Regions:
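Extracytoplasmic
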Residues: 12-47, 64-68, 153-157
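Hydrophobic core of transmembrane alpha-helices in multi-pass small-molecule transporters
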Residues: 22, 91, 102-118, 143
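Small-residue-rich segments within alpha-helical transmembrane domains of MFS-like 12-TM solute carriers
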Residues: 25-29, 112-121, 150-151
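Intracellular juxtamembrane helix-capping segments at the cytosolic ends
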Residues: 39, 117-131
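Juxtamembrane helix-start elements in MFS-like secondary transporters
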Residues: 45-54, 139
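Short hydrophobic/small-residue motifs within alpha-helical transmembrane segments
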Residues: 55-62, 147-149
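Conserved MFS/SLC helix-loop-helix module at the cytosolic interface between two early adjacent transmembrane helices
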Residues: 63-102
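Glycine-rich segments within core transmembrane alpha-helices of 12-TM secondary carriers
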Residues: 134-154
Length: 162
Protein backbone atom coordinates (compact mmCIF):
# COMPACT_ATOMS: atom_id res chain seq x y z
CA UNK A 1 0.00 0.00 0.00
CA UNK A 2 1.35 3.40 -0.98
CA UNK A 3 1.47 6.06 1.73
CA UNK A 4 -0.49 9.24 1.19
CA UNK A 5 1.84 11.73 -0.50
CA UNK A 6 3.00 14.95 1.14
CA UNK A 7 0.40 17.59 0.13
CA UNK A 8 2.66 20.65 -0.52
CA UNK A 9 5.14 18.65 -2.60
CA UNK A 10 2.31 16.90 -4.41
CA UNK A 11 0.78 20.26 -5.36
CA UNK A 12 4.11 21.47 -6.72
CA UNK A 13 4.56 18.28 -8.76
CA UNK A 14 1.05 18.47 -10.20
CA UNK A 15 1.35 22.19 -10.98
CA UNK A 16 4.77 21.71 -12.60
CA UNK A 17 3.59 18.87 -14.81
CA UNK A 18 0.34 20.77 -15.40
CA UNK A 19 2.06 23.87 -16.74
CA UNK A 20 4.22 21.58 -18.85
CA UNK A 21 1.05 20.01 -20.26
CA UNK A 22 -0.38 23.41 -21.15
CA UNK A 23 2.75 24.27 -23.11
CA UNK A 24 3.15 20.81 -24.63
CA UNK A 25 -0.43 20.59 -25.91
CA UNK A 26 -0.43 24.22 -27.01
CA UNK A 27 2.81 23.91 -28.95
CA UNK A 28 1.91 20.63 -30.62
CA UNK A 29 -1.63 19.29 -30.97
CA UNK A 30 -3.40 22.67 -30.88
CA UNK A 31 -0.79 24.68 -32.79
CA UNK A 32 -2.15 24.31 -36.31
CA UNK A 33 -5.66 25.32 -35.29
CA UNK A 34 -4.31 28.86 -35.20
CA UNK A 35 -1.31 28.75 -37.52
CA UNK A 36 -2.22 26.41 -40.40
CA UNK A 37 -3.98 29.04 -42.46
CA UNK A 38 -1.24 31.70 -42.08
CA UNK A 39 1.41 29.03 -42.81
CA UNK A 40 -0.36 28.01 -46.01
CA UNK A 41 -0.78 31.63 -47.06
CA UNK A 42 2.82 32.64 -46.34
CA UNK A 43 4.61 29.53 -47.62
CA UNK A 44 2.43 28.50 -50.53
CA UNK A 45 2.40 24.92 -49.26
CA UNK A 46 -0.85 23.04 -49.66
CA UNK A 47 -3.14 22.95 -46.66
CA UNK A 48 -3.36 19.19 -47.08
CA UNK A 49 0.40 18.79 -46.51
CA UNK A 50 0.43 21.18 -43.56
CA UNK A 51 -2.35 19.23 -41.84
CA UNK A 52 -0.86 15.90 -42.92
CA UNK A 53 2.32 16.87 -41.08
CA UNK A 54 0.34 17.02 -37.82
CA UNK A 55 -1.22 13.65 -38.65
CA UNK A 56 2.23 12.16 -39.20
CA UNK A 57 3.31 13.65 -35.88
CA UNK A 58 0.36 11.96 -34.18
CA UNK A 59 1.23 8.66 -35.84
CA UNK A 60 4.83 9.03 -34.68
CA UNK A 61 3.58 9.77 -31.18
CA UNK A 62 1.69 6.49 -31.13
CA UNK A 63 4.59 4.52 -32.55
CA UNK A 64 7.03 5.73 -29.89
CA UNK A 65 4.61 5.18 -26.99
CA UNK A 66 5.75 1.63 -26.12
CA UNK A 67 9.38 2.77 -25.94
CA UNK A 68 8.36 5.78 -23.86
CA UNK A 69 6.52 3.51 -21.44
CA UNK A 70 9.60 1.31 -21.07
CA UNK A 71 11.75 4.36 -20.33
CA UNK A 72 9.32 5.64 -17.73
CA UNK A 73 9.34 2.18 -16.15
CA UNK A 74 13.14 2.09 -16.14
CA UNK A 75 14.11 5.70 -15.37
CA UNK A 76 10.95 7.32 -14.00
CA UNK A 77 8.91 10.07 -15.57
CA UNK A 78 11.04 13.11 -14.84
CA UNK A 79 13.76 12.52 -17.47
CA UNK A 80 11.20 11.40 -20.05
CA UNK A 81 9.00 14.47 -19.55
CA UNK A 82 12.09 16.71 -19.63
CA UNK A 83 13.26 15.08 -22.86
CA UNK A 84 9.81 15.70 -24.28
CA UNK A 85 10.13 19.44 -23.67
CA UNK A 86 13.51 19.46 -25.42
CA UNK A 87 12.17 17.47 -28.39
CA UNK A 88 9.15 19.75 -28.74
CA UNK A 89 11.41 22.81 -28.68
CA UNK A 90 13.77 21.33 -31.29
CA UNK A 91 10.83 20.38 -33.49
CA UNK A 92 9.38 23.88 -33.24
CA UNK A 93 12.73 25.44 -34.12
CA UNK A 94 13.03 23.19 -37.18
CA UNK A 95 9.45 24.02 -38.10
CA UNK A 96 10.07 27.76 -37.82
CA UNK A 97 13.09 27.54 -40.11
CA UNK A 98 11.63 25.01 -42.56
CA UNK A 99 12.50 26.08 -46.11
CA UNK A 100 10.14 23.54 -47.65
CA UNK A 101 7.31 21.21 -46.79
CA UNK A 102 9.62 18.17 -46.47
CA UNK A 103 11.56 19.84 -43.64
CA UNK A 104 8.27 20.99 -42.12
CA UNK A 105 7.08 17.37 -42.08
CA UNK A 106 10.41 16.27 -40.57
CA UNK A 107 9.86 18.86 -37.84
CA UNK A 108 6.48 17.31 -37.09
CA UNK A 109 8.11 13.88 -36.81
CA UNK A 110 10.39 15.31 -34.10
CA UNK A 111 7.39 17.00 -32.48
CA UNK A 112 5.58 13.65 -32.66
CA UNK A 113 8.33 11.98 -30.65
CA UNK A 114 8.04 14.83 -28.14
CA UNK A 115 4.26 14.40 -28.01
CA UNK A 116 4.64 10.68 -27.39
CA UNK A 117 7.07 11.39 -24.57
CA UNK A 118 5.22 14.22 -22.92
CA UNK A 119 1.48 14.51 -23.44
CA UNK A 120 -1.15 12.94 -21.18
CA UNK A 121 -0.23 9.25 -21.28
CA UNK A 122 3.38 9.66 -20.09
CA UNK A 123 2.29 12.30 -17.57
CA UNK A 124 -0.44 10.03 -16.19
CA UNK A 125 2.01 7.14 -16.03
CA UNK A 126 4.44 9.35 -14.14
CA UNK A 127 1.78 10.33 -11.62
CA UNK A 128 0.76 6.70 -11.27
CA UNK A 129 4.33 5.73 -10.46
CA UNK A 130 4.69 8.60 -8.00
CA UNK A 131 1.40 8.25 -6.15
CA UNK A 132 0.22 4.69 -6.73
CA UNK A 133 -3.32 4.22 -5.48
CA UNK A 134 -3.50 7.95 -4.67
CA UNK A 135 -2.90 8.99 -8.28
CA UNK A 136 -6.54 9.39 -9.32
CA UNK A 137 -7.00 12.91 -7.94
CA UNK A 138 -3.57 13.97 -9.22
CA UNK A 139 -4.53 12.79 -12.71
CA UNK A 140 -7.84 14.64 -12.45
CA UNK A 141 -6.07 17.85 -11.46
CA UNK A 142 -3.52 17.42 -14.24
CA UNK A 143 -6.31 16.97 -16.77
CA UNK A 144 -7.83 20.25 -15.61
CA UNK A 145 -4.50 21.99 -16.27
CA UNK A 146 -4.29 20.44 -19.72
CA UNK A 147 -7.78 21.67 -20.49
CA UNK A 148 -6.47 25.22 -20.44
CA UNK A 149 -3.92 24.57 -23.21
CA UNK A 150 -5.96 26.05 -26.04
CA UNK A 151 -7.24 28.91 -23.88
CA UNK A 152 -3.68 29.91 -22.94
CA UNK A 153 -1.78 28.99 -26.09
CA UNK A 154 -4.06 30.03 -28.95
CA UNK A 155 -3.72 33.73 -28.12
CA UNK A 156 0.03 33.28 -27.61
CA UNK A 157 0.37 31.40 -30.91
CA UNK A 158 -1.58 34.07 -32.73
CA UNK A 159 0.43 36.85 -31.07
CA UNK A 160 3.72 35.14 -31.92
CA UNK A 161 2.66 34.98 -35.56
CA UNK A 162 1.76 38.67 -35.86
Amino acid sequence: MTAAPDRPRRSIVIASIGFGQILAWGSSYYLLAVLAEPMVRETGWSQAWVIAALSLGLLTSGLVSPAVGRRIERFGGRPVLAASAVLLAIGLLIQAAAPNVAVFIAAWLVIGVGMGAGLYDPAFSTLGRLYGEHARSAITHLTLFGGFASTVCWPLDRRAHV
